[in-house]
Amino acid sequence: MQKQSTTMLSDLPKDVAEEVLSKFPVTSLRRVRFTCKKLNTLSKDMSFTRKHIDKEEAKKKQSKEFHVVMMLDFRVSLFSLNLLNPNPIERLGQLVSLDGGAQVDISNIFHCEGFLLCTTKDISRVVVWNPCVGQTIWIKPRNSFNKWDRYALGYDVMKNHKVLRFVDDGEYGRRHLLCEFEIYSFESDSWEVLDVNPDWEIDFVHRGLSIDGNSYWFARDKVVPYGGQDPSYFLLCFDFTTERFRPPLPLPFQPYFGDTVALSSVGDNQIAVLCQRSSSPYTLKIWISSKVEPNAVSWNKLFLKVDMKPLTGNSFSYSGGSFFVDEEKKMAVVLDKNIGGGFDPTRNIAYIIGKEGYFKKVDLGESRHL
């Protein structure tokens, strides 16, 4: 009797191995890494991660469900959103520790196609993390990190990933107290100083987002203090191929002092912008782009407009917060904090807002991050 040969997963060609790995759910990939060296290497591959995420998202779209990564109370968790369910937002679990040991408090995250750039609460470390497979790359500073640092993760046309770090603590027309712009290349494992003298500024609370490898922020003109001139607000792009900031891009609105503003990504290559007025009736408006490129942006008609006074009685607590939109259902999910009074704790709240008065408030639990 002829002995049958056994084909191991590690013997398969790369394209076949990719197809096999893509059948595993994201939550199982970390265990798969320990089966063999080849699968471990493949599961860490950035192109494979992108393909795996695309397949997962296609499955979720068919089931009217999608997953989002959110940071609550210095922890990064995976949530399931299905706005048709009685319980529309469900925490699936906290993502594993970055270093495999004690939990690390995270102060900020920046997402780029399945990868998270995280900064620690104690400002001592910066890490790029693939939560699907547990891969981490800790990045050492050129000199030192600063508590006012802003970061972005992106890639150039050759798919070389890079990290932008910048801090601009100064006023227009005056001496800069601290102004540093530098970029880290994973390919060379080194930092390079960029020559940037900005006439714009980005508020520290405004986090950027990644579209097609480039990063976008809410920004405004840097004006002379008490000069009597109101700044203009715009969208600002950092191009990771040219390693330069591009000229300002127009917004579909101009905010006033005290208004709540935020950015969110829609799909793989569009941007949503939110603006809520700070005066009654606290009107909330959301627009979605029709085209986004480093040197051009155009906006569709208004996606959602809701007077929030009858629903919440006031405006949201802070600018730069997170929100998501569901284009198909014409709904938005806005994350905020309900500040407790007296001995009442502050709570993390999600507001689900839709057309024709649809409104639902979801309590995500007590907050220890005020």
Curated annotation (Swiss-Prot):
Q: Indicate the segments forming the F-box domain, all copies.
A: 6-52
Cited InterPro entries:
F-box-assoc_dom_typ1 (IPR006527), F-box-assoc_interact_dom (IPR017451), F-box-like_dom_sf (IPR036047), F-box_dom (IPR001810), Gal_Oxase/kelch_b-propeller (IPR011043), SCF_F-box_component (IPR050796)
Would you say which domain of life the source belongs to? Eukaryota
A Pfam cross-reference name: F-box
Q: What is this protein called?
A: F-box protein At2g18780
The organism encoding this protein is Arabidopsis thaliana
